[in-house]
């Protein structure tokens, strides 16, 4: 009888552990999904971000400038330029 109770107790414990692992996995997937959704939505701003097409530096965000001669992309401001 004691062995049956021990086995039943272990089975219940195993079931609880499995259920908590499934909940933890769902929680991680929800966080990953939320991060991806936030990253994939376009930002609304008055300037163009890095590596976006531009024609003049005033179109690019602060800290970057348009390299229209070379690539036509907004890039980081380089020292000495």
Curated annotation (Swiss-Prot):
Coiled coil: none annotated. Disulfide bonds join 47-61, 54-66, 60-74. The keyword Signal applies. One of its GO terms (cellular component) is extracellular region. InterPro entries: Huwentoxin-1. GO terms for molecular function: ion channel inhibitor activity. Residues 20-45 form a propeptide. Its main location: secreted. Residues 1-19 form the signal peptide. It is found in: Secreted. The modification Proline amide is found at residue 79. Expressed by the venom gland. It comes from the Eukaryota. Keywords: Amidation, Disulfide bond, Knottin, Secreted, Signal. Belongs to the neurotoxin 10 (Hwtx-1) family. The presence of a 'disulfide through disulfide knot' structurally defines this protein as a knottin. No toxicity is observed upon intracranial injection into mice and intrathorax injection into crickets. This is U9-hexatoxin-Mg1a. It comes from Macrothele gigas.
């Amino acid at each position: 009888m004691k062995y049956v109770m021990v086995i039943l107790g272990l089975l219940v414990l195993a079931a609880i552990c499995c259920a908590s692992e499934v909940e933890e996995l769902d929680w991680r997937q929800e966080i990953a999904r939320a991060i991806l959704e936030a990253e994939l939505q376009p930002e609304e701003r008055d300037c163009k971000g890095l590596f976006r097409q531009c024609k003049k530096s005033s179109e690019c965000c602060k800290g970057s400038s348009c390299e229209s001669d070379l690539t036509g992309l907004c890039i980081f401001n380089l020292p000495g330029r």
